[in-house]
Amino acid sequence: MSLMDNWKTDMESYDEGGLVANPNFEVLATFRYDPGFARQSASKKEIFETPDPRLGLRDEDIRQQIINEDYSSYLRVREVNSGGDLLENIQHPDAWKHDCKTIVCQRVEDMLQVIYERFFLLDEQYQRIRIALSYFKIDFSTSLNDLLKLLVENLINCKEGNSEYHEKIQKMINERQCYKMRVLVSKTGDIRIEAIPMPMEPILKLTTDYDSVSTYFIKTMLNGFLIDSTINWDVVVSSEPLNASAFTSFKTTSRDHYARARVRMQTAINNLRGSEPTSSVSQCEILFSNKSGLLMEGSITNVAVIQKDPNGSKKYVTPRLATGCLCGTMRHYLLRLGLIEEGDIDIGSLTVGNEVLLFNGVMGCIKGTVKTKY
């Protein structure tokens, strides 16, 4: 039985399990827009640099799958060689000083290409949107190029064809502000886009003006792999399993099951910190199992645990999609590069003090440490 078939057998029980708080849910994608992923060369203003191709931000196979409307291939990450060599290089980010590819930016089309490179894993985001819409039987005719245009128009607050369009595009490619992008598609196929400015201070603390574009990407999006990473979230392991369904496998606005868990996480973290139970908390996550006791995911992240291979080397293992975890784009990307691998993880094997890797398409990868079970 395929993963899609497994989801279909669960459809009748969604309402009974209280998973669909809002029957008018929207399919959701959230991802990062970051000018640091395609930025102006220090020596030539018409040249924009993007990360080294070895970092795999663009994949021609994925682009071809989109052209062929083969969206289900997203669920089958092609086999790759071990990412051990790449991981070793990533752990020395300053070694990527001159490794990049370039875009000569002279026309509006070139500027749009620069902006496209700044949307993190946009191709994979589009694939995941399409497969989710197909599952929920939602008609959708927006192409990847159309989606890019809508994203740009939202960021510059100007429609293509407007007399100010060219000027605003030019201004946009020179700005440094990062955004959390939200693409929402209704059950009638209507699309809306939100751009939420991200706090820049935490991002700028991770990098320097002298970093290459590849080094910037590694320090901001692959930070959890770095030996000297200073970011480490507090992690709660939930004692209550999550009911795996299409509403855990796909990202939608029906998220009450996650919201309830984050309230329990808030209480657990405040107990640890000696704070009032309802005090706001940040930089923390709660991890769930499914009803079979297998680790699934976090409330806002996918997760990988650290294990040892037969040679004693560290490896990162993430739950299989069959557990019901979100088919996240960052998860897909890390699997594609061989930086993580899939496996079954008994949630009972997680103990206080264990280090984990947390990741999503907005914050990238960060370290976390299990602090308590609750």
From Swiss-Prot:
Keyword line: Cytoplasm, Folate biosynthesis, Lyase, Pyridoxal phosphate
Gene Ontology MF terms: 4-amino-4-deoxychorismate lyase activity
Signal peptide interval: none
Principal location listed in the UniProt entry: cytoplasm
Subcellular localization, as worded in the UniProt entry: Cytoplasm
Annotated Gene Ontology cellular component terms: cytoplasm
Cofactor(s) listed in the protein's UniProt record: pyridoxal 5'-phosphate
Catalytic activity annotation: 4-amino-4-deoxychorismate = 4-aminobenzoate + pyruvate + H(+)
Source taxon at top rank: Eukaryota
Pfam families membership: Aminotran_4 (PF01063)
Its EC number(s): 4.1.3.38
Class of this enzyme: lyase
Gene Ontology biological-process annotations: carboxylic acid metabolic process; folic acid biosynthetic process; tetrahydrofolate biosynthetic process
Pathway annotation from the record: Cofactor biosynthesis; tetrahydrofolate biosynthesis; 4-aminobenzoate from chorismate: step 2/2
Disulfide bridges in this chain: none
Subunit structure: Homodimer.
Miscellaneous note of the record: Present with 768 molecules/cell in log phase SD medium.
Record function comment: Converts 4-amino-4-deoxychorismate into 4-aminobenzoate (PABA) and pyruvate.
PANTHER family membership: AMINO-ACID AMINOTRANSFERASE, AMINODEOXYCHORISMATE LYASE
Annotated family: Belongs to the class-IV pyridoxal-phosphate-dependent aminotransferase family.
Name of this protein: Aminodeoxychorismate lyase
